UniProtKB/Swiss-Prot annotation:
It comes from the Bacteria. Keywords: Disulfide bond, Fimbrium, Secreted, Signal. Disulfide bonds join 58-97. Its main location: secreted. This is PRS fimbrial minor pilin protein. Belongs to the fimbrial protein family. The lineage of its organism: Bacteria, Pseudomonadati, Pseudomonadota, Gammaproteobacteria, Enterobacterales. The gene is prsH. The keyword Disulfide bond applies. It comes from Escherichia coli.
Length: 195
């Protein structure tokens, strides 16, 4: 009994030592059928591959990613006499847009949606301004007159070409509180979703 017990232990020890000090198996540049011969390789196997062909999204023109828009100076009397003050135009320019198409015809689902993020003003269609000025908020409208709401997706804009300019208007609007002179600023983010 002792002889049978010690032989297997010795055998496994040799295999372990041999495995530690042996080179790579099979040798580099040689497959198992080459190493053992075709007739000795008997296992079956399967390789599964998968992937996806995608339409890349439009890219934003880098100079439009970070914009500083100077609203200028506005006399308090200009705001006292009306609901809104100065307006400034700005654009988000898209590049390298690819569309759903067949034979050069665009399908109706080639469009984008823009969401502006910022601190909500006194009403959902306005953005809060920081600084010393009081009684005013910021409002954003697209080229079709749709007003942006903080964190809400704006209506879809159909894409018609490889390069698109999404035009918007920023305006200073009264928020119903007492007007006070001073500086103001806001930092707004935006997200472009491509369909």
């Amino acid at each position: 009994m002792r002889l049978r017990f010690s032989v297997p232990l010795f055998f496994f020890g040799c295999v372990f030592v041999h495995g530690v000090f042996a080179g790579p198996f099979p040798p580099p540049g040689m497959s198992l059928p080459e190493y053992w011969g075709e007739e000795h390789v008997w296992w079956d196997g399967r390789a599964t591959f998968h992937g996806e062909v995608v339409r890349p999204a439009c890219t934003l023109a880098m100079e439009d990613a970070w914009q500083i828009i100077d609203m200028g100076e506005t006399p308090v009397r200009d705001l006292q006499n009306g609901f809104s003050g100065p307006e400034r135009k700005f654009s988000l320019r898209l590049r390298n847009c690819e569309f759903n198409s067949q034979g050069g015809n665009l399908f109706s689902d080639s469009r984008i949606r823009v969401t502006f993020d910022g601190v909500r003003g006194e009403t959902p269609d306005k953005f809060n301004l920081s600084g010393q000025a009081k009684g005013i908020n910021l409002q954003i409208a697209d080229a079709r007159g749709n007003i942006a709401r903080a964190g809400k997706v704006m209506p879809a804009i159909p894409l018609t070409g490889n390069e698109e300019a999404l035009d918007y208007t920023l305006r200073i609007v009264r928020n119903g509180k007492k007007l006070e002179a001073g500086n103001y600023f806001a930092v707004l983010g935006f997200r472009v979703d491509y369909e």
